[in-house]
């Protein structure tokens, strides 16, 4: 049996360059709560956040300090299934090794711990000739609204010595994105009957029958960019 779907969407990705001097003293408090079992303000994370941020009170600069820490200290590594990890940020920070999703949820957790609203996003990195899975984060600073942080791509740029690209990925994304998930560890709609392969991240969905879930080696999936055009 073959199941297919074609999705059309538009992406507006204006470049922003927020300045700390323009940040409001009063900031919102939404999306600053814990979300167990991974977005949890443990004693270790509280101590680390204090070490990273110090006495900084400017929301934009707090987020930048967290971004700088992750992108300059950590490197990309493939991960075991998230389902097997008790606490993703602590796992990542214990060795400063992890994939794009681990880096994103660590950024979200540290931002929230420091009072900066932050959310998870994941989906596809869709260049005109290819499409692949990717995760990133976004954070909210008034008066600018939602800004992006791609710690994985930013860290890669930093290690390559491309500081312009490193700075770009704090606040911005290029237009090669198709977000499919804007919340971490959320249920599908309609909900799954059986245990998910990954109950936290979702980039391309999962498969189940009426009687059981299907494992990755039991089906094939293929994602392609059919057409890409610049809009006026």
PLM feature segments, named:
Residues 1, 92, 96-99, 103, ...:
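Secondary-structure capping and boundary motifs in well-ordered enzyme cores
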Residues 1-77, 84-90, 94:
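Acidic low-complexity segments
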Residues 62-66, 96-111:
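Active-site nucleophilic cysteine motif
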Residues 78-79, 119:
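A local structural micro-motif
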Residues 83-84, 124:
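Residue-level "edge-of-site" marker
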Residues 102-192:
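Hydrophobic/aromatic-rich core segments of domains that either
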Residues 171-232:
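Low-complexity, Gly/Ser/Thr/Pro-rich intrinsically disordered linker/tail segments
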């Amino acid at each position: 049996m073959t199941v297919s779907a074609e999705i059309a969407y538009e992406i507006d990705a204006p470049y922003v360059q927020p300045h700390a001097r323009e940040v409001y003293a009063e900031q919102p408090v939404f999306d600053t709560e814990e979300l167990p079992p991974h977005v949890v303000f443990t004693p270790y994370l509280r101590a680390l956040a204090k070490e990273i941020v110090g006495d900084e009170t400017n929301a934009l600069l707090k987020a930048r300090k967290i971004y700088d820490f992750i992108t300059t200290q950590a490197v990309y590594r493939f991960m075991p299934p998230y389902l097997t990890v008790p606490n993703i940020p602590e796992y990542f920070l214990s060795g400063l090794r992890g994939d794009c999703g681990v880096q994103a949820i660590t950024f979200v957790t540290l931002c929230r711990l420091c009072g900066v609203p932050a959310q998870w996003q994941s989906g596809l990195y869709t260049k005109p000739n290819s499409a692949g899975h990717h995760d990133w984060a976004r954070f909210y600073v008034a008066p600018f609204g939602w800004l992006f942080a791609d710690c994985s791509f930013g860290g890669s740029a930093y290690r390559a010595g491309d500081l312009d690209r490193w700075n770009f990925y704090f606040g911005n994304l290029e237009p090669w994105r198709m977000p499919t998930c804007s919340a971490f560890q959320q249920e599908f709609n309609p909900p799954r009957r059986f245990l998910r392969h990954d109950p936290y991240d979702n980039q391309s969905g999962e498969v189940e029958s009426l009687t059981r879930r299907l494992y990755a080696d039991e089906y094939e999936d293929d994602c392609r960019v059919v057409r890409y055009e610049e809009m006026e």
